[in-house]
Amino acid sequence: MGLIARVRKEWFIIGIVLVITFAKLQPSVGVKGGPLHPEITITYVAVSVIFFNSGLSLKTEELASALMHVKLHFFVQTFTLVFFPIAIWLLLKVLALTAINEWLLRGLQTVACMPPPVSSAVILTKAVGGNEAAAIFNSAFGSFLGIVVTPLLLLVFLGSSSSVPFTSIFSQLFMTVVVPLIVGQVCRRFLRECLDRRKPPFGAVSSVVLLMIIYSTFCDTFNNPNIELDHLSLLTVVFIIFSIQLSFMALIFFLSTRKSSGFSAADSVAIMFCATHKSLTLGIPMLKIVFEGYEHLSLISVPLLIYHPAQILLGSVLLPSIKTWMSGRQKTLTPI
């Protein structure tokens, strides 16, 4: 395979390296209030584009079918909002015996209490040919559910509570997730024949938007002065976060691919991404609300700032392997 062909095939991985490098060199460009204005372009425009794109590309019957997949939805929401925080709480009982900063450990617990994101899990699921409709439903439903459940979980595990502006957060989710999805579906009704004939690069569009989200996320990470902890603490937290993600992804893969689970290969991919990913977009504002006035808020936020880009990086690196597994699974199930 020639160099140009290799670049075309691996353009997304190359793009990740480039945007992270640029974020490191010029983090001020992609932070809130910077030239990119991510508080608008990422929070509203990028997320809206992702779900409009999904609405335009998804067959209505597939989305309707996903809504009825109750077993899958129950599995995802139970794992991410019940099993995840309890498992991390038990892990932190052990880690509390070490020299790791107490507030960083509390930050890990806040990560566990967060809802799934409304973008990355959908894009990664779509990129490998997983059950995109199920990923969309669980990302949106989990985000709405998390607005109520996450503050309660933080109260239970960390003893912190505050009045949460449910109305404004629900409104934002409705406008950036539900409305674009519906508009995309309506447009598809009128453009179905054209879309089926031309086959627009929906996956490439979503991948470009994801690169924007990665860039903005790393700009925030590199621009945050509170990230400058000692190297050992940072490396320890990064190692713990990647270990948690890999362990939980492996656990979900094992549970969802058993014959008795009743899930297809496409379902397993959607479950794996939706149940292990956590929302930075909802998480950071929620932490600022729930922990308002906390002297150590910045330290509590560090694990979430690391977890979000880590989940996107890990998912992106695993894409080729998951694609290969999906192809092999489909060939096995295809009758000769």
From Swiss-Prot:
Coiled-coil annotated residue ranges, if any: none
PANTHER family: SODIUM_BILE ACID COTRANSPORTER 7 (PTHR18640:SF5), SOLUTE CARRIER FAMILY 10 MEMBER 7 (PTHR18640)
Keyword Cell membrane: yes
Keywords: Cell membrane, Endoplasmic reticulum, Golgi apparatus, Ion transport, Membrane, Sodium, Sodium transport, Symport, Transmembrane, Transmembrane helix, Transport
Membrane disposition: Multi-pass membrane protein
GO molecular-function terms, A-Z: symporter activity
One GO cellular component, as annotated: plasma membrane
Protein name: Sodium/bile acid cotransporter 7
Residue spans, topological domain Extracellular: 32-37, 93-116, 160-163, 223-233, 292-298
Gene3D superfamilies in the record: 1.20.1530.20
Native source organism of the sequence: Danio rerio (Zebrafish)
Cell location: Cell membrane; Endoplasmic reticulum membrane; Golgi apparatus membrane
Reported consequences of knocking out the gene: Morphants have reduced head and eyes, a curled body, tooth cartilage that is bent downwards, reduced Meckel cartilage, absence of the fourth ceratobranchial cartilage, shortened or absent palate cartilage, widened palatal skeleton, reduced cleithrum, notochord, and lack of bone mineralization.
Secretion signal span: none
Cytoplasmic side: 1-10, 59-71, 138, 185-201, 255-270, 320-336
Main location: membrane
